[in-house]
């Protein structure tokens, strides 16, 4: 069984994306009668990323937690190393979306800890989307998680990221930092790169004078 890849781009410079070196990324949600979740990866060339589908019951060999099979299918952008999809972002069949954004200099991952769900950074997106239908379900899992500093391989070091997780009802931001795991309610449904999310939210005050209304002459 393998992940279904939907393009045939070359895998040039793939290690850069795994390291988490980006220029500017933003993930955003939008809800009308439907729920929309998307992000941009603002680079001028491909890292070998492909539109990738992971089906239900797809096996992941988690480094600390052992065998894991997805309950829900997902689709997103990933670099596929062998048959292992390294997701940058994805949405599962229940409409739960997740994306990792650059958080260099702030992300802190820890050593495995007994009694916790020890999940590597590259395992995080499929581990959440593979078994959660909503943000609320994910909150329960996140109460027991320990994001660990395990590399995918010697060629692919750990990416320094923070994440947005969203469904049609709510969004949260997840940041592993020096003091521990911070989980923020995200009322705007948007996340970009550095700085930490609380500072991003505060900086919206700089734009409070803006309006979507047409200016009056």
What are these regions (language model features)?
Residues 157-209:
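Extended amphipathic alpha-helical segments with heptad-repeat/coiled-coil character used for oligomerization
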Residues 22-117, 144, 149:
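A contiguous strand-loop segment
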Residues 10-23:
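Short, Lys/Arg-enriched N-terminal segments with co-localized hydrophobic residues
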Residues 130, 154-157:
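Short, contiguous, pocket-lining structural segments
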Residues 115-146:
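Alpha/propeptide regions of enzymes that mature by internal proteolysis
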Residues 140-155, 162-164:
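Secretory/export targeting leaders with adjacent low-complexity proregions
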Residues 67-82, 131-136, 140, 200-217:
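A short, charged
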């Amino acid at each position: 069984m393998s992940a279904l890849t939907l393009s045939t781009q070359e895998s040039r410079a793939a290690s850069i994306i795994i390291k988490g070196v980006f220029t500017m990324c933003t993930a955003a949600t939008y809800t009308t009668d439907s729920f929309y979740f998307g992000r941009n990866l603002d680079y001028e060339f491909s890292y070998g990323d492909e539109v990738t589908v992971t089906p239900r019951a797809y096996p992941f060999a988690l480094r600390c937690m052992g065998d894991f099979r997805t309950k829900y299918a997902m689709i997103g952008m990933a670099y596929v190393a062998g048959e292992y999809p390294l997701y940058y972002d994805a949405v599962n069949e229940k409409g739960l979306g997740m994306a990792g954004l650059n958080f260099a200099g702030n992300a802190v991952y820890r050593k495995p800890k007994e009694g916790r769900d020890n999940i590597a950074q590259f395992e995080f997106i499929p581990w959440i989307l593979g078994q959660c239908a909503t943000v609320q379900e994910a909150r329960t899992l996140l109460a027991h998680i320990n994001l660990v500093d395990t590399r995918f391989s010697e060629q692919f070091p750990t990416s320094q990221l923070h994440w947005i997780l969203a469904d049609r009802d709510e969004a949260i931001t997840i940041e592993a930092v020096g003091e521990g795991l911070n989980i923020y309610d995200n009322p705007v449904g948007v996340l970009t790169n550095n700085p930490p999310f609380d500072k991003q939210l505060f900086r919206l005050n700089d734009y409070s004078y803006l309006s979507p209304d047409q200016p009056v002459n």
